[in-house]
Amino acid sequence: MKILKRILLLMCMIFAFTSCSLLFPNSGPEVTTINTPASFTRAQRSAYVEGATVGVEKAIRSKLLQRNWKVSSRATGNETFAIVFDQLNIDKYSDGGFISSTYYEYTGYVSIFDVRNNERLCVYNFTKESLGDLLEGIEKAVIEVEKSMR
């Protein structure tokens, strides 16, 4: 009987530890830094977005405008950085409930390039992310780039 109680207690402890570990999600998006950018000034905080859909591009533009970046939808020659979606897949899900909702999941990877010397600065791989999580990863990559601002 004591052995059975210990086995049940052990199973309850394992269940408690595994369910409590779900309360602490990962710390955020993983951005891989490849090269450090050459130093730049606040006036050179400009980028263009390439390879994104119109909705994603508008969301990136509004997010970076909050950080005082100038963002355009195509290269005009005045930009310092390029945000390039090397791959972007969008999966659309809708539930069949009384009030139908549509969900989008984004998969792919995005790179930030320094247009002045054509170097890839950082890469953000994302899998089944919401638009908010995707923007958070791009913002984290931009923060890494901003560390070289003088």
Describe the residue ranges of each PLM region.
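C-terminal partner/receptor-binding element of secreted or periplasmic proteins
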Residues: 121-150
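Bacterial N-terminal signal peptides that target proteins for export
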Residues: 1-8
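Extracytoplasmic/periplasmic, Sec-exported soluble proteins
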Residues: 48, 52, 56, 102-104, ...
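General small-molecule cofactor/ligand-binding pocket signal
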Residues: 72-74
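A structural "domain/chain start" motif
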Residues: 3, 18-69, 150
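Surface-exposed short loop/turn segments
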Residues: 27-28, 66-67, 77-128, 132
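Bacterial N-terminal signal peptides
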Residues: 9-19
